Amino acid sequence: MIYFDNSATTLPLKEVVDSFMTVSTKYFGNPSSLHGLGATAEQLLNQARKQVADLLQVQEQEIFFTSGGTEGNNLAIKGTALAFKSRGKHIVISAIEHASVKETCEQLKTLGFDITEVPVDSSGRVSVEEVMKAIRQ
């Protein structure tokens, strides 16, 4: 799984803003709706999915769009943890993870996962040595 996050402080390219404005003002239908606006929005969404899949050389059904970082983090972490739980139920995170990461890991604890939180230095960096100590075989 590849997860993209355009940080909340990243200035988007002008072309991205222009595209967003066009889609937001002309193709604002719910892509799950049966009406014409919805059908048009669904076509546009499917076109975007195909473009991303082609770029990444993956299947279209492997591309998921989420409403934001929290939903994306939740999907990526739970999806990966549950898909690979037969390989182990131990997750290593840093002490400065986003709340959505920490909360998702707390939920996974209720499903029997162990969560290890590694510290960061004064610059907010994670030490490779700390990660290596936290990893279980």
What residue ranges belong to the model's regions?
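Pyridoxal 5′-phosphate
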Residues: 1-137
